[in-house]
Amino acid sequence: SILYVNHQLGFSMEMPLNWMGQVEVEEEYGLHHQNGGNCITFYHKPTHDNGEGGILFFIDCYPGEWSEDNPPVIAGHSVVVAQTENYTYLLRTPSDVEYSESDPMLAEAYQSLIAQQDFIISHIYATGQTVISPNE
């Protein structure tokens, strides 16, 4: 598998090998939302490059305790994937259509990655060692 490691937020995530070269990652830190959240966006690169969204999922990392019934970000559907003393990590799926509606091949490629989401959810590990300090 491919390993994505985020030292700032103290977590790693395994992705299936067939994701190699197909995924683009955008990292946003210190968002002005719920006492300073962090959001890592994973895109299906070919769909995103085509200007058609392509968001596979987000990893939200927020200080404090959050649950699936009370997530820090309301849009989409969140699953708690890890919890440390200071942070909750959630995998959030987009609430709108992100696959290509014009190119069936692109749509199929996107869907094949989405179909492996359960693998991702069970392969996210928080180290508890974050570089950013939680807001007091």
Task: Identify the function of each model-found stretch.
Residues P46-F57, Y89, D96-M105:
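Short, surface-exposed beta-strand/loop "edge" segments at domain boundaries and coil↔beta transitions
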Residues I40, T88-Y89:
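Hydrophobic residues embedded in beta-strands of well-ordered beta-sheets
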Residues S1-V5:
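N-terminal low-complexity, Pro/Thr/Ser-rich intrinsically disordered segments
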Residues I74-Q83:
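Short, surface-exposed beta-strand/loop micro-motifs that present aromatic residues
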Residues L91-E136:
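Surface-exposed amphipathic alpha-helical segments
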Residues Y62-G64, S78, A109-L113:
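Short, low-complexity, polar/charged sequence segments that are solvent-exposed and flexible
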Residues Q8-N70, V80:
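Secretory pathway targeting signatures of secreted, lumenal, and periplasmic proteins
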Residues L17-N18, Q83-T88, P94:
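Short, solvent-exposed coil/turn segments at beta-strand boundaries
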